[in-house]
């Protein structure tokens, strides 16, 4: 059976996007890499593990077969897997993609193998002509599924593909804006996860609202420095994919990255925090990859650097904060 859209990844965000598109009347296929999970969703008509209260409409089907999901998508494939699985997922589905099907992704992070942006990975695997787009912005899956008002940025390689995506997503409670700035849309989504961990650590240490606001604001400044160095535009980082996603993820406890940081700040064992959250914490890998990318590009990202040291070098969180405060005074914005 042909579908307009196949969504690869049946976690909370992949399922939420599949539900959004299917509720808009677009035939959609949702792929899970675990056969037992796919079979349970097909039988129960819901994703009991992640979004148990959302019933699947008739326009949403489920499969455990990645080749089927790729081959039957006539219009586009939407990848919603963790960043560490992005390259492998594309490698596996690439031989089966329809020639005219575009590629979208809602994954927020960098390529673990090369440390590059995900559109570079997609171009490497799929070639230069495939329509590409990234979905990024301040969206929690549970709120989208509950049909609470939400908005995102669609960074698309062509105006026509961006308009198509908006037609699949847009409705009375979900608004999508387009941009051709794929770099800014991707880096906003990747950097904010690291900064959300930093904000969580600060709150876990009990440093208060002033410190949180300073971390968010200065975090935005270093996110912008890296993004502009890579060719992004300022307005993208000041929009939904940048400041919007950063504020949401750094301040609300629905954020897995923020909750992880809270636990670290309170001195809890990492394994215990991971087990309690039970899902991917993208900011951990992103802290290393973004820190390394900033080093290659000569971009100063002090909050990211101290977060990296806490996560990978065992630096006590209190010392990381002290290192940030003891930096030499400087103008707020570079000239």
From Swiss-Prot:
A Pfam family it matches: NAD_Gly3P_dh_C
Keywords: Cytoplasm, Lipid biosynthesis, Lipid metabolism, NAD, NADP, Nucleotide-binding, Oxidoreductase, Phospholipid biosynthesis, Phospholipid metabolism
Source organism per UniProt: Methylococcus capsulatus (strain ATCC 33009 / NCIMB 11132 / Bath)
Stored InterPro entries: 6-PGluconate_DH-like_C_sf, 6PGD_dom2, G3P_DH_NAD-dep, G3P_DH_NAD-dep_C, G3P_DH_NAD-dep_N, NAD(P)-bd_dom_sf
Binding annotation for NADPH: 12-13, 33-34, 108, 141, 256, 282
Protein family membership: Belongs to the NAD-dependent glycerol-3-phosphate dehydrogenase family.
Gene Ontology cellular component annotations, sorted alphabetically: cytosol
Pathway participation: Membrane lipid metabolism; glycerophospholipid metabolism
GO molecular function annotations of the record: glycerol-3-phosphate dehydrogenase [NAD(P)+] activity; NAD binding
Main location: cytoplasm
Function in brief: Catalyzes the reduction of the glycolytic intermediate dihydroxyacetone phosphate (DHAP) to sn-glycerol 3-phosphate (G3P), the key precursor for phospholipid synthesis.
PANTHER family reported for this sequence: GLYCEROL-3-PHOSPHATE DEHYDROGENASE (PTHR11728), GLYCEROL-3-PHOSPHATE DEHYDROGENASE [NAD(+)] 2, CHLOROPLASTIC (PTHR11728:SF1)
Organism lineage string: Bacteria, Pseudomonadati, Pseudomonadota, Gammaproteobacteria, Methylococcales
Localization: Cytoplasm
EC id: 1.1.1.94
Catalytic activity reported: sn-glycerol 3-phosphate + NAD(+) = dihydroxyacetone phosphate + NADH + H(+); sn-glycerol 3-phosphate + NADP(+) = dihydroxyacetone phosphate + NADPH + H(+)
Binding site for sn-glycerol 3-phosphate: 108, 137, 139, 192, 245, 255-257
Protein name stated in the entry: Glycerol-3-phosphate dehydrogenase [NAD(P)+]
GO biological process: carbohydrate metabolic process; glycerol-3-phosphate biosynthetic process; glycerol-3-phosphate catabolic process; glycerophospholipid biosynthetic process
Active site per database record: 192
């Amino acid at each position: 059976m042909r579908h307009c859209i196949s969504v690869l990844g049946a976690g909370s965000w992949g399922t939420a996007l599949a539900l959004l598109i299917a509720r808009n009347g677009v035939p959609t296929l949702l792929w899970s890499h675990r056969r037992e999970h796919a079979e349970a969703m097909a039988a129960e008509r819901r994703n009991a593990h992640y979004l148990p209260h959302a019933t699947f409409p008739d326009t949403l089907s489920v499969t455990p077969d990645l080749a089927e999901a790729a081959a039957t998508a006539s219009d586009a494939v939407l990848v919603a897997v963790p960043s560490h699985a992005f390259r492998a997922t594309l490698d596996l589905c690439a031989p089966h993609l329809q020639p005219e099907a575009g590629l979208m992704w809602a994954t927020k992070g960098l390529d673990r193998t090369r440390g590059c942006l995900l559109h570079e990975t997609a171009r490497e695997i799929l070639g230069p002509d495939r329509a590409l787009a990234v979905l990024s912005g301040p969206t929690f899956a549970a709120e989208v599924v509950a049909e609470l008002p939400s908005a995102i940025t669609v960074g698309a390689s062509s105006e026509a593909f961006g308009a198509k995506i908006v037609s699949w997503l847009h409705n009375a409670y979900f608004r999508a804006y387009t941009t051709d700035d794929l770099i800014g849309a991707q880096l906003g989504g990747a950097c904010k996860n690291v900064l959300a961990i930093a904000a969580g650590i600060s709150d876990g240490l009990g440093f208060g609202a002033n410190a949180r606001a300073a971390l968010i604001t200065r975090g935005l400044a270093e996110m912008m420095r890296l993004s502009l160095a890579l060719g992004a535009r300022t307005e993208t980082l000041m929009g939904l994919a940048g400041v919007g996603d950063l504020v949401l993820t750094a301040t609300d406890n629905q954020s897995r990255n923020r909750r992880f940081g809270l636990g670290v700040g309170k001195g809890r064992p990492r394994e215990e925090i991971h087990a309690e959250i039970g899902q991917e914490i993208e900011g951990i890998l992103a802290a290393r990859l973004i820190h390394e990318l900033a080093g290659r590009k000569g971009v100063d990202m002090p909050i990211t650097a101290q977060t990296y040291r806490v996560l990978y070098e065992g630096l006590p969180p209190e010392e990381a904060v002290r290192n940030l405060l003891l930096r030499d005074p400087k103008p707020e914005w570079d000239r």
